A protein has these predicted regions:
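Cap/lid segment of the alpha/beta-hydrolase catalytic domain
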Residues: 89-115, 221-222
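The feature captures the conserved acid-bearing segment of alpha/beta-hydrolase catalytic domains
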Residues: 164-248
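C-terminal catalytic histidine-bearing segment of alpha/beta-hydrolase fold enzymes
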Residues: 223, 243-287
Length: 287
């Protein structure tokens, strides 16, 4: 998807929404147009909201989107942000289209970028900007578990305008190499999606790997496949290993490296606790 096309799309979506009412204070929902697949989005706007950014929240494999919206209320109140949490239901968005972003079709062929699930996110952001009549409203993203997997791969292929992308406790990572097959690495992808320029841009993306130090057991729909186990025995180890590999590669090549890693002590594979932790603010808004 070219930057010119994306800019035109965002402008059109913002203009369409300009005459709609702004997001109401408290919890709510809206439907975001998306061709034949409209997306239901759960929201929370603090009653004291002024002009803070948007926080797009991504649910886990359980698709419990309303819970995730509620988990993020503490972040909304603490930082004065509008929370928007899209539902990627299992029927329309199985793991190939959610955790792996729809990069490949059911036959393993690369799809056009407009068909990627990542391409839905700019539409949601544009819709919110239109509702709020703030076409330059900045946005941040955070996802836990399967939502974290979605975001690490989004960071590689379509980071958009996100100020910061926070992947919390993902079960597998996209390592910056062509040895591991996609979605564990860039192996098997065509050159235009796996060459050094792609990996260089990935390492320059504003990605935070946010880990609970007690997420160190193979539980909660853990990826115990051979490809997964290459990355480490548990989520904590995998996150640390991916960050170290990325940092080392960037240093060796002299590339920009904008990743961060943040750990919160004593928390396991629990989105509610990860979002409520003091370190969540550092993961999102720290420098």
């Amino acid at each position: 998807m070219s930057s010119r096309f994306l800019a035109a799309l965002l402008c059109a979506l913002v203009c369409r929404a300009l005459h709609a009412d702004p997001i109401a204070a408290g919890p709510g929902t809206f439907e975001c147009p998306n061709g034949t697949e409209p997306i239901t989005v759960f929201t929370y706007k603090p009653p004291t909201y002024k002009d803070g950014p948007v926080l797009v929240v991504f649910h886990g494999v359980g698709r419990n989107v309303e819970d995730y919206r509620n988990f993020a209320i503490t972040l909304a109140e603490r930082f004065g942000v509008i929370v928007v949490t899209p539902l990627f239901d299992k029927d329309r968005f199985p793991s190939s289209r959610y955790q792996r972003g729809g990069l490949l079709d059911p036959n393993g062929k690369t799809q056009a970028s407009a068909a990627w699930t990542y391409a839905v996110i700019p539409k949601i952001v544009a819709h919110v900007r239109g509702l709020e009549a703030k076409p330059k409203l900045p946005y941040y993203m955070i996802g836990h578990s399967a939502g974290g997997q979605f975001l690490v791969r989004l960071a590689a292929f379509m980071p958009g305008e996100a100020v910061r992308i926070v992947a919390a406790n993902p079960g597998s990572h996209l390592f910056p190499d062509r040895v591991q097959q996609f979605g564990y690495g860039f192996g098997g992808l065509p050159d235009e999606l796996s060459n050094d320029d792609v990996i260089r841009r990935y390492l320059a993306a504003p990605l935070t790997i946010y880990l609970g130090t007690a997420d160190n057991t193979p539980e909660h729909s853990f990826d115990a496949s051979p490809a997964g186990m290459v990355q480490g025995p548990h989520r904590l180890a995998r996150g640390r290993a991916c960050f170290a590999a990325a940092q080392t590669l960037a240093k060796e090549r002299g590339w920009a490296f904008n990743w961060r890693t943040v750990e919160t002590p004593g928390i396991g594979h629990e989105a509610a606790f990860m979002f409520a932790a003091q370190e969540a603010g550092d993961a999102l808004f720290g420098k």
